[in-house]
Amino acid sequence: MSDRAEKRRRKKRREMLRWVRSLLIAVAVALCIKMFLLDFIRIAGVSMNDTLVTGDVVLATKFDYWFSSPQRGDIVLISVPGREGTFVKRVIGLPGDEVIIQGDSTFINRAYYDEPFVSNEAREDFIVVLGENEYLVLGDNRYSSHDGRDSDIGLLPENAFKGRVRCIVSPFSRFGGV
């Protein structure tokens, strides 16, 4: 093999190795972003109708609750102890709150809480006083949501929050903040 052919072969090999290395770095960066910073979730189910509907893809940030606590009204990703998967709900009750739901009205610490995002009235009245490090999460579709009113989800500790939903990214016709 001539020197010229050998040099061409080495150059192609170096270019290929450079390309593979760049691809591996890009994959590693994407995985780190997915694992620690951002997540895309496809909505399945009706519990957050009409805010989020089946088929919506939402962008969630995973770092929001590293340095601060969930706030009332946040749409959040949660993991429920003993249940598989990630759920999307809205934070309604904070530690120490008394939450009363009567029909289509919600009261927090005896004051009416306006919820323009709720699509229908609750399936039943509900009263709870939250303890220290307890949060109440509910779906916006109060009649059909499986949420903090149900014993298998219940009141959640702060470490159950895995991220905050920021916007709908798909379908494009619904693109925007939540």
Feature map (PLM): residue ranges:
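Soluble "head" domains of membrane/secretory-pathway proteins
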Residues: S2-L17, C32, F36, I41-R42, ...
